[in-house]
Amino acid sequence: IFLLIGGLIGAFIAYKIPMTAMPELVAGFHSLVGLAAVFVAIAAFLNPGAFNLGSPGNIKLGSLIEMSIGAAVGAITFSGSIIAFLKLQGIMSGSPITFKGQHPLNALILISIIVITYFLCSTQSSNLFWILLSISFLIGFLLIIPIGGADMPVVISMLNSYSGWAAAGIGFTLENTALIITGALVGSSGAILSYIMCKGMNRSFFNVILGGFGATEQSASSQNKEQRPVKSGNADDAAFLMKNASSVIIVPGYGMAVAQAQHALREMVDTLKKNDIKVSYAIHPVAGRMPGHMNVLLAEANVPYDEVFELEEINNDFANADVAFVIGANDVTNPVAKTDPQSPIYGMPVLDVEKCKSVLFVKRSLSPGYAGIDNDLFYKENTLMLFADAKKMTEDITKNL
C-alpha cells in the first residue's frame, strides 16, 4: 500500500514539474534517497532484531560496518542535495561560498567519519552513531556550498552517484540483493558520468569530491563591469543573415529551456533546411542544469540525432560556419575561459562560437550567466544581440524566413 501511495505521489510530482525545473526535481529526489538510507540505518541500529542483525549493543560486525557506511553516505547525499536544490532554485546564491581553511576542514571531517566508524564498530555506542550522522550531514553541506553555479551539472551527477552508494550500503544491511545491485549500478554510472564531465570541463575529479572548484577569484574585468558597446538587432536582421548563409550552427542553453523554445527552434530549423541551408546543433557537456539537459529538450522536439553534435565533434566547424545562433547558452560560449586565468571558468573547454562569421545571440538582457561573470562574446564585432524571449524571437525569425 505504501509503495503504491509513494509511487503515485512521485508520479504526480514528476508529471506536474515543467522540464525547466527538472534539475531541481532530480536534486530533491536524491535528497529523499539519502534520507531513506539514514532512516533505515537508524531503525536497524535501534532495533537490530527486526532486521535479524543481532540485539542492541551486540549487532553483527559486518552489518554494523555496512549500516555505518550507508548512513554516512545517505546523510551526505541528503544535505548535499538540499544545498544543490536551494542553489538551483535561486533560494541560495549560486556563487561559490568559501572560507579560509575549507579544504583542511573537509579533510578533517572525512577522516573523523572513518575514525568514528571504527570506534562505533568496536564499542557500538549510540552516542558515536549520532555523532557520525551529525558530522555526515555537516560534510554534505560543506562539500556543495563552495561549488559554483556553472558546475552544477557535475554536482547533480555526483549526488546521483552518492545516492546509489547509499542505497547499496543499506541493501547490504537489509540483505536485499535487488537494492545492492540497483544501488551499485546507479553509484558506478553516476561516478563514471561525473568523471567524463570533469574531463570535458578540464576539472579535477578529486576537486569535485572535496568541493570547491569553480571558486577562483573573479578577474577585475568581471568584477568591475564597464559599459561596452553592443550591436543589437531584431528578427528581420537575423532572418536576413540566415537566409544568406550556407551553414548555421545552433547553440542551445538554459535560456532555451526556460523559454520552452525547443519546438519553435525545430520549426525554424525545418524552414532553414527547406532553403538548402545546412544546420547542426552544438551541445556543450554542461549546458543547462543537469547532464544531458539539452539533449532531452531537443529529443522532446524530435530533433534528428544525426544533427546533434558534442563539443569535441563540432568545435572545429565554427570557423567555417556562416552563422551561429546562440539561444540562451551563456557561460559555455564565453571566450574568457580561454584567455583570463582569473576567471572562475578558466580552463573549461567552451564552444568556439566567436570564430563564426556572424553570431546571433538571443538573450533577454546583458546579465551574466550562472557563473556570475560577464560574457565577452556579447561585445565582439561579429555578434548581433537579439534582446527578447527566446521562444518569441525564434518564432518571429521563422515568420521572416
Predicted regions located by residue number:
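Transmembrane alpha-helix boundary signature
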Residues: 12-23, 38-56, 123
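Membrane-interface helix termini and inter-helical loops of multi-pass transporters
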Residues: 47-61, 90-95, 298
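Membrane-interfacial segments at transmembrane helix termini in multi-pass membrane proteins
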Residues: 185-245
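Structural signature of hydrophobic alpha-helical transmembrane segments
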Residues: 1-8, 63-78, 124-135
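Structured cytosolic domains appended to multi-pass membrane proteins
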Residues: 226-401
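Mobile "lid/hinge" segments at catalytic clefts and subdomain interfaces of large enzymes
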Residues: 148, 162-206
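C-terminal ends of transmembrane helices
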Residues: 8-26, 81-96, 139-152, 194-198
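Cytoplasmic-side transmembrane-helix entry/capping segments in multi-pass membrane proteins
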Residues: 1, 21-33, 96-108, 153-162
